[in-house]
């Protein structure tokens, strides 16, 4: 049986941590930053862990893990 292909969009957006959690970047930090406060842009700088177990499971399946 052939191997499953990795979802290209998912592999660009998500990374797995050593413990198996799914890491993602936060939204709203790509453009139009001029009118956003420095406080907001700093807060959006860090990565987040995907909190919903169902979503994390679906992402892992797309990544082939």
Swiss-Prot record:
Family statement drawn from the similarity comment of this UniProt entry: Belongs to the bacterial ribosomal protein bL35 family.
GO MF terms, alphabetically ordered: structural constituent of ribosome
Family annotation (PANTHER family): 54S RIBOSOMAL PROTEIN BL35M, LARGE RIBOSOMAL SUBUNIT PROTEIN BL35M
NCBIfam families: rpmI_bact
HAMAP family: Ribosomal_bL35
Record gene name: rpmI
GO biological process: translation
Record keywords: Ribonucleoprotein, Ribosomal protein
Name of the protein: Large ribosomal subunit protein bL35
Region called Disordered, residue ranges: 1-29
Listed GO CC annotations: cytosolic large ribosomal subunit
Ribonucleoprotein in keyword set: yes
SUPFAM superfamilies given in the database record: L35p-like
Pfam family, one: Ribosomal_L35p
Organism: Kocuria rhizophila (strain ATCC 9341 / DSM 348 / NBRC 103217 / DC2201)
Domain of life the protein comes from: Bacteria
Xref: InterPro entries: Ribosomal_bL35, Ribosomal_bL35-like, Ribosomal_bL35_CS, Ribosomal_bL35_sf
């Amino acid at each position: 049986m052939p191997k499953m292909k990795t979802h290209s969009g998912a592999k660009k957006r998500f990374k797995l941590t050593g413990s198996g959690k799914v890491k993602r970047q936060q939204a709203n930090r790509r453009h139009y930053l001029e009118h956003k406060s420095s406080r907001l842009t700093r807060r959006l700088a860090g990565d987040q862990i995907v909190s919903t177990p169902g979503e994390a499971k679906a992402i892992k399946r797309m990544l082939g893990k």
